Amino acid sequence: MDKVFELKNVSYFYTPKVPALIDISFDVKLKEKLFILGANGSGKSTLLKLMDGLIYPHEGQIRFFGKVIGDKRTFDEYEFRRRVGFVFQDSDVQLFNTTVFDEIAFAPLQMGVKKEEVEKLVNEILISFGIEKLKDRPPHRLSGGEKKKVALASIIVINPDVLLLDEPTNGLDPRSKKWLLSKLEELNQKGATLVIATHDLEMAKKFSDRIIILNEEHKIETIGSPEEILNDEKLLLKANLI
């Protein structure tokens, strides 16, 4: 099956009269780099949380490789958590262990990987991400770019098939941003499917395969190629992206 996610008529409400998302339908294809663009408050973060099963839609359904997320009869929560990683916009939300090493080791230990194997995996990730010198540091004392690296490393260590990333370049300096894009490209080349919510048009232009625009009415405005969407000034103005 080449559809990783299938969303059909998904709606979510903060309160009965305050919608976050209305009638959202789209598919995510295997190994693609799908960008979700929208102004602040359009529902991008909520959409990623729905796709990660952190919250559930009030209307419609979301399927992951054909199985409805949250369906107690057919949905395997453990398998889903192994295959899908979520990188939050605010790295501090994600980082809660006392050292960088423990942070990266947390997920594989929770998955039941043997301690010796976990140590090997973590050391490999530390080297791959160029953060081996940080392994004994408390995550909350790191710079923004370092925190983002640790947050991503703590997800990559379990080798997920899918990465959901919420504003991954937010607050990063140019060097850290360049590193992040290079690492995401490397992961995609190895087969990872990427779903990225952002209002970073430059990143979308360089990196996306397909783009979804969320409007300020919390609906999908359009879906198309980077060329179609990013060259349409009227569309970008309407969506409050420029």
Swiss-Prot record:
InterPro entries: AAA+_ATPase, ABC_transporter-like_ATP-bd, ABC_transporter-like_CS, ABC_transpr_CbiO/EcfA_su, ECF_ABC_transporter_ATP-bd, P-loop_NTPase. One of its GO terms (molecular function) is ATP hydrolysis activity. Pfam families: ABC_tran. Disulfide bonds: none annotated. It is a peripheral membrane protein. Its EC number is 7.-.-.-. Keywords: ATP-binding, Cell membrane, Membrane, Nucleotide-binding, Translocase, Transport. GO terms for cellular component: ATP-binding cassette (ABC) transporter complex. CDD domains: ABC_cobalt_CbiO_domain1 (cd03225). Residues 5-242 form the ABC transporter domain. ATP binds at G38, A39, N40, G41, S42, G43, K44, S45. PROSITE patterns: ABC_TRANSPORTER_1, ABC_TRANSPORTER_2. SUPFAM superfamilies: P-loop containing nucleoside triphosphate hydrolases. It is found in: Cell membrane. Belongs to the ABC transporter superfamily. PANTHER family: ENERGY-COUPLING FACTOR TRANSPORTER ATP-BINDING PROTEIN ECFA2 (PTHR43553:SF27), HEAVY METAL TRANSPORTER (PTHR43553). Probably part of an ABC transporter complex. Responsible for energy coupling to the transport system. This is Putative ABC transporter ATP-binding protein TTE0246. It comes from Caldanaerobacter subterraneus subsp. tengcongensis (strain DSM 15242 / JCM 11007 / NBRC 100824 / MB4) (Thermoanaerobacter tengcongensis). The lineage of its organism: Bacteria, Bacillati, Bacillota, Clostridia, Thermoanaerobacterales.
